[in-house]
């Protein structure tokens, strides 16, 4: 085996070689039989003309003999020369930097003067010329080759050719090229040196006159290769960064490629360092390393990557390495090559040629060996550059790119929803069976592009809406005046298309003609050049102007885009569309453009208005109508019927039938005036079916009256002829909008004295008024009540058609009215949460005139909250709406306005009351959403006997406090009990918490039961003649029964 000699070997002269001076033309040099030693240890070590241990002994003797004959040895570097002229020329340029001499073990000392071997110089000034075939060579020997020997080559000196640049091999670089030792990537091994058969003809080397020019070209090539290696390393790092989040579809392959890339990076770093240290060395392994690092995609031909000065040099292919013409069409330098296209492979990268690692960058169903370069280019042509997914067609890639851009170009013409594909839009259109599908609505996305830069219509950017245009309508607009944005922006796209800051001025495209609804996207104009998809994929790059490239440009411009067009300029919240943004702005401005023409309530959206209009719709043919037994007036609500009967009994309503048109109002009845000037009267049939707490508290009340609510002592007047006008809207705090109707007393306010309406105010009601006023200061701001008058008995318009809603309406009005001492409203039920109210009521009369002057300001209406002020004044919490704030305030005040009419429990919200109703479970089959409960047990107690009423309730409650005609009292109770017994299923329990009262005279009340009066038979109208007579005690001072009772004093099962 070979061994490395000392660092500075000395040439030893042999006795038998002295005196012989005839030059020998050829002495095959020795080389390492184990090629890894010179390749790894010293890249510049000569590995020319290797000899092997397998050569026969006679060949070795011949080699020794040739080396001893006429060899001139340099004393400084021990270089050996065959010619005296070369030896003399060498002496002039020789330095004391000796090469490493590698010899075979069987070789003996070589004489210093006779040896004519090859030149082993490493000097950059004399490579490639010391071991060349000389023209002046004398004798020659025939090329001899043993049949079974492959490593020894004998050259004929007479066949030496003059050096021609066209015959110089790319592997020469100043070294002997006619050798059977080559650097080649071997499969399954990391050995970089391979021995070829001696059949290949040796290549001639350049002459001495071309050495400086060759050295200059080599230096240029080294610089180019260093730059290419650095560029390749940068590309590898960037691809690794992409692979961290892009190659999710092939996780195992991505990890393997990363590991291989890191290994290659280390080897490249070592090679670059070696190139810097051995700049003058021109070894074969170094040359192969340089050539392997040339990006294949940048090699249009076999010599295109070389310096222009090296153009005369041609690449000499051998039997196993052929330069294919398709190298310029390879998709990427990162892709593994087929075996037939292994070109300039590095000895360090032979691991990449393993079969198990060939197909890591391709889909699993495609073999790396079977795919031709042209097929690879077609395969990776439709590859997503963001997630590395490969698609079969360009249209599939476009659809996929929309998942990155977020754009949805297909818009439903009915509802405005957007979709990424036409098929999804067609499927969605089936949801609109009332609209006939128009084939033109499903225009192909590829054909609908904007003029100028070819951006699709749906990729255009919508403008943010102009705030003054918020009040126009609720429909989304496609084009509005832009606010602070270029005029070439358009509307009608997904807000998720563009986010981020504003575009530079040089990326703004010019205005383009109208096409499909708007101009084009900023920053994607024809003058804006974006990186193409698959930056290293050669022909895989989309063609300029294609839809795929535009979509990729859109993804790249997302971070550079303008401010989101659907972002609120006030709170910077991003909405889903322009219409949502417009409705969102109304939360800041307090605007409610949609007003109910019946009750005057305003809403921010048309949908809420439509929902509200269902409250006013009545269908008397379906709903049960209850007729008054006295005047035969029909009611759809039993609560209003009972109030109507109470007014009959109190003399507030004449006992004669009312006019046919109950909507004929007196002059004192205010009309509902809308913002658009339309007026509407409140008819008793247009009663409110359902008033939700959220709707009541969040409503906007349009202003049609300038009257200011007056303090409590000044609004009480007992004129029975005054009209009573009631509005159902209880305006909520915190909303900006015109006030609805200030329902105030139309009678005498100037006298200052208050006549009792029949309900005695005492200290407890005053304190309740005070407490409630402190809890809810904004409750009284728009609602004041008027006295009932026979001329206008439309008080039932405040009540609900259904007992459940009426119960809530009364709970929110009657409790407030009675706690504020407003006795003018005849209330059937007294809403007092029994959980915290326990009042002992004296029988003495306390009028409102006895109120302390210091308490009067507490009862005055508080100023309205301004818009956007939904903050709790006690704890500082903020809420999104006035309804939420109102519910929250009940946690501070302890107010529980929703009371169960069965067990008496009170709740803060209607929803909690609904849930509580389900716990009783009795008679829920006939309940309307759990709130309309029949009271058969109560009817069983009442029966048909008039005396049963007095037996059920205490006498001190039932005994009239004024002189009442016994005939009227007996007839009324008989009628009531009989009617209830007949129509049991139509009686519903609405309220509890107090005992409902039945007035028998003006203001005098008595408790009948916890039920409301349902439909009364016309047969009971016979008592109308007796009831028509007004009571003789109308002028007598009135007394009242207690407002509140203890929680457990009376319970209705």
UniProtKB/Swiss-Prot annotation:
Annotated Low complexity bias: 20-46, 698-708
The keyword Nucleotidyltransferase is assigned to this record: no
UniProt biased composition (Polar residues): 483-496, 743-776, 788-797
Annotated region (Disordered), positions in chain: 1-62, 116-149, 483-546, 694-714, 736-776, 788-828, 1018-1039
GO cellular-component term (any): protein-containing complex
Record's compositionally biased regions (Basic and acidic residues): 130-149, 810-821
Cross-link Glycyl lysine isopeptide (Lys-Gly) (interchain with G-Cter in SUMO1): residue positions: 156, 316, 374, 838
Gene3D superfamilies: Classic Zinc Finger
PTM note: Isoform SALL4B exists primarily as a ubiquitinated form.
Cross-link (Glycyl lysine isopeptide (Lys-Gly) (interchain with G-Cter in SUMO2)): 156, 175, 190, 290, 316, 372, 374, 436, 550, 597, 623, 838, 896, 932, 947
Cellular compartment(s): Cytoplasm; Nucleus
Keyword Repeat among UniProt keywords: yes
Tissue: Expressed in testis. Constitutively expressed in acute myeloid leukemia (AML).
Family: Belongs to the sal C2H2-type zinc-finger protein family.
Function, as annotated: Transcription factor with a key role in the maintenance and self-renewal of embryonic and hematopoietic stem cells.
Subunit structure: Interacts with POU5F1/OCT4. Interacts with NANOG. Interacts with BEND3. Interacts with NSD2 (via PHD-type zinc fingers 1, 2 and 3). Interacts with NRBP1.
Disease: Duane-radial ray syndrome: Disorder characterized by the association of forearm malformations with Duane retraction syndrome.
Protein name: Sal-like protein 4
Protein source organism: Homo sapiens (Human)
Annotated gene: SALL4
């Amino acid at each position: 085996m070979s061994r490395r000699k000392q660092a500075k070997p000395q040439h030893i002269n042999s006795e038998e070689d002295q005196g012989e001076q005839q030059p020998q033309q050829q002495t095959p040099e020795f080389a390492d039989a184990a090629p890894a030693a010179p390749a790894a240890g010293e890249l510049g070590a000569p590995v020319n003309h290797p000899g092997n241990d397998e050569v026969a002994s006679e060949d070795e003797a011949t080699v020794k003999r040739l080396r001893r004959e006429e060899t001139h040895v340099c004393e400084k570097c021990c270089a050996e020369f065959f010619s005296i002229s070369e030896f003399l020329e060498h002496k002039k340029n020789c330095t004391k930097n000796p090469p490493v001499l590698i010899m075979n073990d069987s070789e003996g000392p070589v004489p210093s003067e006779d040896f004519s071997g090859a030149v082993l110089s490493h000097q950059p000034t004399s490579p490639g010329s010391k071991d060349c075939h000389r023209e002046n060579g004398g004798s020659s020997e025939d090329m001899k080759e043993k049949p079974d020997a492959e490593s020894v080559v004998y050259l004929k000196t007479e066949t030496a050719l003059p050096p021609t640049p066209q015959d110089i091999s790319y592997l020469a670089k100043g070294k002997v090229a006619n050798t059977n030792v080559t650097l080649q990537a071997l499969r399954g091994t990391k050995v970089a040196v391979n021995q070829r058969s001696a059949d290949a003809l040796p290549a001639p080397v350049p002459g001495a006159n071309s050495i400086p020019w060759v050295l200059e070209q080599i230096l240029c090539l080294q610089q180019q290769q260093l730059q290419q290696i650095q560029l390749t390393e940068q590309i590898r790092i960037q691809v690794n960064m992409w692979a961290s989040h892009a190659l999710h579809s092939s996780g195992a392959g991505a990890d393997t490629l990363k590991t291989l890339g890191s290994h290659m990076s280390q080897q490249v770093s070592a090679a670059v360092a070696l190139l810097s240290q051995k700049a003058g060395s021109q070894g074969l392994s170094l040359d192969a390393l340089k050539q392997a690092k040339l990006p294949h995609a940048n090699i249009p031909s076999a010599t295109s990557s070389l310096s222009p000065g090296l153009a005369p040099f041609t690449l000499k292919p051998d039997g196993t390495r052929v330069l294919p013409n398709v190298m310029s069409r390879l998709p990427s330098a990162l892709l593994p090559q087929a075996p037939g296209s292994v070109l300039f492979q590095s000895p360090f990268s032979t691991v990449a040629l393993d079969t198990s690692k060939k197909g890591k960058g391709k889909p699993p169903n495609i073999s790396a060996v079977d795919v031709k370069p042209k097929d690879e280019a077609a395969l990776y042509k439709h590859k997503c550059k963001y997630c590395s997914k490969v698609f079969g067609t360009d249209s599939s890639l476009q659809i996929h790119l929309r998942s990155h851009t977020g754009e949805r170009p297909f818009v439903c013409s009915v509802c405005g929803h957007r979709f990424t594909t036409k098929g999804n839009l067609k499927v969605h259109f089936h949801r609109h069976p009332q609209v006939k599908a128009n084939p033109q609505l499903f225009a192909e996305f590829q054909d609908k592009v904007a003029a100028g830069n070819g951006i699709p219509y749906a990729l255009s950017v919508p403008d943010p809406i102009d705030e003054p245009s918020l009040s126009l309508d609720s429909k989304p607009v496609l084009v509005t005046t832009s606010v602070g944005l270029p005029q070439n922006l358009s509307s009608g796209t997904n807000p998720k298309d563009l986010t981020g800051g504003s575009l530079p001025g040089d990326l703004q495209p010019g205005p383009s003609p109208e096409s499909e609804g708007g101009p084009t996207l900023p920053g994607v104009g024809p003058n804006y050049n974006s990186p193409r998809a698959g930056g290293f994929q050669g022909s895989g790059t989309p063609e300029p102007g294609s839809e795929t490239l535009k979509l990729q440009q859109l993804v790249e411009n997302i971070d550079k885009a303008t401010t989101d067009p659907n972002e609120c300029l006030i709170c910077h919240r991003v909405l889903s569309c322009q219409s949502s943004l417009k409705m969102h702005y109304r939360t800041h401005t307090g605007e409610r453009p949609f007003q109910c023409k019946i009750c005057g309530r305003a809403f921010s959206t048309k949908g809420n208005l439509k929902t509200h209009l269902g409250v006013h719709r009545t269908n008397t043919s379906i709903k049960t109508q209850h007729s008054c037994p006295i005047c035969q007036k029909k009611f759809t609500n039993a609560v209003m019927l009972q109030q109507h009967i109470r007014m009959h009994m109190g003399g507030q309503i004449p006992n004669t039938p009312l006019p046919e048109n109950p909507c004929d109002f007196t002059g004192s009845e205010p009309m509902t005036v809308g913002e658009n000037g339309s007026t509407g009267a409140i008819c008793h049939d247009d009663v409110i079916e359902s008033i939700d707490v959220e709707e009541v508290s969040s409503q906007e009340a349009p202003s049609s009256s300038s009257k200011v609510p007056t303090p409590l002592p000044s609004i009480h007047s007992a004129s029975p002829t005054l009209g009573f006008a009631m509005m159902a809207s209880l305006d909520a705090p915190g909303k900006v909008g015109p006030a609805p109707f200030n329902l105030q007393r139309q009678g005498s306010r100037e006298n200052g004295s208050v006549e009792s309406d029949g309900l005695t105010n005492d200290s407890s009601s005053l304190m309740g008024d005070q407490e409630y006023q402190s809890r809810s200061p904004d409750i009284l701001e728009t609602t004041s009540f008027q006295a009932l008058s026979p001329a206008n008995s439309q008080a039932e318009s405040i009540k609900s058609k259904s007992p459940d809603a009426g119960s809530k309406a009364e709970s929110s009005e009657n409790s407030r009215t009675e706690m504020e001492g407003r006795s003018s409203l005849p209330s059937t039920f007294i809403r007092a949460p029994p959980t915290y109210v326990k009042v002992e009521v004296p029988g003495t009369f306390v009028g409102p005139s006895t109120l302390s002057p210091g308490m009067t300001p507490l009862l005055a209406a508080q100023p309205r909250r301004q818009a956007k002020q939904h903050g709790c004044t006690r704890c500082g919490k903020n809420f999104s709406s006035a309804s939420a704030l109102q519910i929250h305030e009940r946690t501070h005040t302890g107010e529980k306005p929703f009371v169960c009419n069965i067990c008496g429990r009170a709740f803060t919200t209607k929803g909690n009351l609904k849930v509580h109703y389900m716990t009783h479970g009795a008679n829920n089959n006939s309940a309307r959403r759990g709130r309309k409960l029949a009271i058969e047990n109560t009817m069983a107690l009442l029966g048909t006997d008039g005396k049963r009423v007095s037996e059920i309730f205490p006498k001190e409650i039932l005994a009239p406090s004024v002189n009442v005609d016994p005939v009227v009292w007996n007839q009324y109770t008989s009628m009531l009990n009989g009617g209830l017994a007949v129509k049991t299923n139509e009686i519903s329990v609405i309220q509890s918490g107090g005992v409902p009262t039945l007035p028998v005279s003006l203001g005098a009340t008595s408790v009948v039961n916890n039920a409301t009066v349902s439909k009364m038979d016309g047969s009971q109208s016979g008592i109308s003649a007796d009831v028509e007579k007004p009571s003789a005690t109308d002028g007598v001072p009135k007394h009242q029964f207690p407002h509140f009772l203890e929680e457990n004093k009376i319970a209705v099962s």
